[in-house]
Amino acid sequence: MSQYKTGLLLIHPAVTTTPELVENTKAQAASKKVKFVDQFLINKLNDGSITLENAKYETVHYLTPEAQTDIKFPKKLISVLADSLKPNGSLIGLSDIYKVDALINGFEIINEPDYCWIKMDSSKLNQTVSIPLKKKKTNNTKLQSGSKLPTFKKASSSTSNLPSFKKADHSRQPIVKETDSFKPPSFKMATEPKVYRVVDDLIEDSDDDDFSSDSSKAQYFDQVDTSDDSIEEEELIDEDGSGKSMITMITCGKSKTKKKKACKDCTCGMKEQEGKEINDIRSQQDKVVKFTEDELTEIDFTIDGKKVGGCGSCSLGDAFRCSGCPYLGLPAFKPGQPINLDSISDDL
């Protein structure tokens, strides 16, 4: 049993619906000589209801149905899993989405043969490395081939052929006195540029036409003789219709009467008269309709001599009667036959 590696199996809550996936994972781990000594749900570890021991497991396997590119794992648990692993322990089940968090928590990412994270040994990371310092070589130091290093001499002042420069003589420069009058250059004011206007020929032609039409109208009114006598309004009225009123009132087609409608603020009593007429019409419409004996015989088929009813099918039975027929439920009978309870006692 000691040859098996101790492992921890973390399960996503969605995997609980497929227990065969858990069994297959355990079988694959057993083939690699890994035995899961503990098995927890990831949400239990996330909410703190379960705590892990430090440096207890050699392998931690996270089982989830999510794709590698869609894995959602609490980042705070990466450090918890790192503490629970032994040095050189492996974490399986996460992807490169949390690559930065893995490097921060001391994991080394392995891509081959299987993708996993390996916890690096902290003792090796904290070891100090001594770096030997090289001694300064002298001029007599020889190279590995046996030849000496090249030497360089400092150039002397006598052997240097650098160019020489002389300071300029300020005495030869022109001196400007304050008494000398300085005349600034004169400038002439530029003349305004000429502006040339380009006019379309079509616009000029239209303007000429408008001007000619206006002038022709003015000439026409000048030629009109204003001395002519104006036409009087009375001359426009015919002699036959001069004595008759031109305004007519529309008469009713039925009553042949001419009646004016009452004004909105009527004070002559016409509005009250119209209201009375309207009330009379409404009262006639509200009267209860009463049937005479002759009218009742047309709808009551039980009277002698009346062979049919209102719909003509009441005597045939319920299958032929209307929904509001008063004889619903009674057996079929002959038209004109009196109905009593003795005749239907067998059906009751």
From Swiss-Prot:
<keyword id="KW-0001">2Fe-2S</keyword>
<comment type="similarity">
    <text>Belongs to the anamorsin family.</text>
</comment>
<feature type="modified residue" description="Phosphoserine">
    <location>
        <position position="206"/>
    </location>
</feature>
<feature type="region of interest" description="N-terminal SAM-like domain">
    <location>
        <begin position="1"/>
        <end position="162"/>
    </location>
</feature>
<keyword id="KW-0408">Iron</keyword>
<feature type="region of interest" description="Fe-S binding site A">
    <location>
        <begin position="252"/>
        <end position="268"/>
    </location>
</feature>
<dbReference type="Pfam" id="PF16803">
    <property type="entry name" value="DRE2_N"/>
</dbReference>
<feature type="binding site">
    <location>
        <position position="263"/>
    </location>
    <ligand>
        <name>[2Fe-2S] cluster</name>
    </ligand>
</feature>
<comment type="subunit">
    <text>Monomer. Interacts with TAH18. Interacts with MIA40.</text>
</comment>
<feature type="region of interest" description="Linker">
    <location>
        <begin position="163"/>
        <end position="242"/>
    </location>
</feature>
<keyword id="KW-0496">Mitochondrion</keyword>
<dbReference type="GO" id="GO:0016226">
    <property type="term" value="P:iron-sulfur cluster assembly"/>
</dbReference>
<dbReference type="InterPro" id="IPR007785">
    <property type="entry name" value="Anamorsin"/>
</dbReference>
<dbReference type="GO" id="GO:0051539">
    <property type="term" value="F:4 iron, 4 sulfur cluster binding"/>
</dbReference>
<dbReference type="GO" id="GO:0005758">
    <property type="term" value="C:mitochondrial intermembrane space"/>
</dbReference>
<feature type="compositionally biased region" description="Polar residues">
    <location>
        <begin position="144"/>
        <end position="163"/>
    </location>
</feature>
<dbReference type="InterPro" id="IPR046408">
    <property type="entry name" value="CIAPIN1"/>
</dbReference>
<feature type="region of interest" description="Disordered">
    <location>
        <begin position="137"/>
        <end position="170"/>
    </location>
</feature>
<comment type="function">
    <text>Component of the cytosolic iron-sulfur (Fe-S) protein assembly (CIA) machinery required for the maturation of extramitochondrial Fe-S proteins. Part of an electron transfer chain functioning in an early step of cytosolic Fe-S biogenesis, facilitating the de novo assembly of a [4Fe-4S] cluster on the scaffold complex CFD1-NBP35. Electrons are transferred to DRE2 from NADPH via the FAD- and FMN-containing protein TAH18.</text>
</comment>
<dbReference type="Pfam" id="PF05093">
    <property type="entry name" value="CIAPIN1"/>
</dbReference>
<dbReference type="GO" id="GO:0009055">
    <property type="term" value="F:electron transfer activity"/>
</dbReference>
<feature type="binding site">
    <location>
        <position position="266"/>
    </location>
    <ligand>
        <name>[2Fe-2S] cluster</name>
    </ligand>
</feature>
<feature type="binding site">
    <location>
        <position position="311"/>
    </location>
    <ligand>
        <name>[4Fe-4S] cluster</name>
    </ligand>
</feature>
<keyword id="KW-0479">Metal-binding</keyword>
<dbReference type="GO" id="GO:0051537">
    <property type="term" value="F:2 iron, 2 sulfur cluster binding"/>
</dbReference>
<feature type="short sequence motif" description="Cx2C motif 1">
    <location>
        <begin position="311"/>
        <end position="314"/>
    </location>
</feature>
<feature type="binding site">
    <location>
        <position position="322"/>
    </location>
    <ligand>
        <name>[4Fe-4S] cluster</name>
    </ligand>
</feature>
<protein>
    <recommendedName>
        <fullName>Fe-S cluster assembly protein DRE2</fullName>
    </recommendedName>
</protein>
<feature type="short sequence motif" description="Cx2C motif 2">
    <location>
        <begin position="322"/>
        <end position="325"/>
    </location>
</feature>
<feature type="binding site">
    <location>
        <position position="314"/>
    </location>
    <ligand>
        <name>[4Fe-4S] cluster</name>
    </ligand>
</feature>
<feature type="binding site">
    <location>
        <position position="252"/>
    </location>
    <ligand>
        <name>[2Fe-2S] cluster</name>
    </ligand>
</feature>
<dbReference type="GO" id="GO:0046872">
    <property type="term" value="F:metal ion binding"/>
</dbReference>
<keyword id="KW-0004">4Fe-4S</keyword>
<feature type="region of interest" description="Fe-S binding site B">
    <location>
        <begin position="311"/>
        <end position="325"/>
    </location>
</feature>
<keyword id="KW-0411">Iron-sulfur</keyword>
<feature type="binding site">
    <location>
        <position position="325"/>
    </location>
    <ligand>
        <name>[4Fe-4S] cluster</name>
    </ligand>
</feature>
<feature type="binding site">
    <location>
        <position position="268"/>
    </location>
    <ligand>
        <name>[2Fe-2S] cluster</name>
    </ligand>
</feature>
<keyword id="KW-0963">Cytoplasm</keyword>
<keyword id="KW-0597">Phosphoprotein</keyword>
<dbReference type="InterPro" id="IPR031838">
    <property type="entry name" value="Dre2_N"/>
</dbReference>
